[in-house]
Curated annotation (Swiss-Prot):
Its EC number is 4.1.1.50. Coiled coil: none annotated. Binds 1 pyruvoyl group covalently per subunit. The active site is at residues 21, 24, 85, 99, 275, 288. It comes from the Eukaryota. Pathway: Amine and polyamine biosynthesis; S-adenosylmethioninamine biosynthesis; S-adenosylmethioninamine from S-adenosyl-L-methionine: step 1/1. The keyword S-adenosyl-L-methionine applies. Belongs to the eukaryotic AdoMetDC family. It catalyses: S-adenosyl-L-methionine + H(+) = S-adenosyl 3-(methylsulfanyl)propylamine + CO2. InterPro entries: AdoMetDC-like, S-AdoMet_decarboxylase_euk, S-AdoMet_deCO2ase_core, S-AdoMet_deCO2ase_CS. This is S-adenosylmethionine decarboxylase proenzyme. One of its GO terms (cellular component) is cytosol. Is synthesized initially as an inactive proenzyme. Formation of the active enzyme involves a self-maturation process in which the active site pyruvoyl group is generated from an internal serine residue via an autocatalytic post-translational modification. Two non-identical subunits are generated from the proenzyme in this reaction, and the pyruvate is formed at the N-terminus of the alpha chain, which is derived from the carboxyl end of the proenzyme.
Amino acid sequence: MSPTLVVDQENSEEFNTSSFEGPEKLLELWFSAPIKTNLSAGEKANLGLKAVSRNDWDDMLAQAQCKVLSVVNSEEIDAYLLSESSMFVFAHKIILKTCGTTTLLASLPRLLEIASSVGFDRPLRIFYSRKNFLYPERQLAPHTSWEEEVRYLQLFFPSGCSYVVGPTNKNHWHLFSDLADDYSLLEDSLDPEDETLEVLMTDMSPERSLQFYAPSLDVVRSARGDDYVREKNNLSGGHILGSYVADESGVRDLCSTSDKKAVLDAFQFEPIGFSSNMIYKDRYATIHVTPQEHCSYASFETNVSQFQFGRSISETIEKTVKTFGANKFCLTLFQAKGASQEKHFSAKLKSFSSYKREEFIVYDFPGYDLIFASFTAV
């Protein structure tokens, strides 16, 4: 089945401003081992979370104070582009990422209720993470401090552990993680090639930031012709501009797989700000940009493999920071443990030209290793 795009015209037209707090809150819940949904004829697929109705997801997202702009669907993933960032729904897990002053954790009770309705009693693995906020004083409960977030999470996951990674007076990263007692059911099925990279960038160059200020449709017509706009008449204005900006800024190239079969869903906010989701088989990438000079921020997250991209992790990182002109960035890399897989952390995250590495930290978690590193332009 080919991926399909569904645009929510009403919400796409309603949300035309960007949040000033770029750094996202990120929640990832695993409810089971990966479920095969692309079964042959005659076999019945277990759709798990993918069986949840749009109304239920809308209800949950309302608790987080965000709405759906559009959805790209495939057999493996439903990728929701939101008014504030993104949501990815697999049969067995969900990833919810929201920026600004959204109240992501306030949606957790409803999320667990929805998961229970499709047969998942509790998550086997929980991740909640975020970079340090630019404007922490603007956040709403339960996000007014990391301590408050941890207290709230422990109401649901009392055995969870809290980590602060990196120097607290510079760029740093928060993580809350928990495992169910029967986590081994999941660990035995982990893909040894599973890697999730997140690059969190600040202090973008003015030249690159300007690429994410909304052009007019007249500018797009002048640059690409009337046919370019006419072909996209089923899209909202934000999606038409998003497609154009993705081409012009290098975002589409950054998200392209080696076989050119990835599907990109992009939205340009007016007057400023950009978001996109990409899906490829059972993999995804997501980008969010807040380009204002005084609080510029861009993020890139993906679990697309090096083989699928046709480039190394280091090459992907270099391409990412060049695309957004970041003067500072930190990154996290979650990598599944594999008996036959050699780990060469320093080789994967080599020194990057024009950047000085300030921090390099490795954590050993059950089933995964985590790398955190931060860099500043020189």
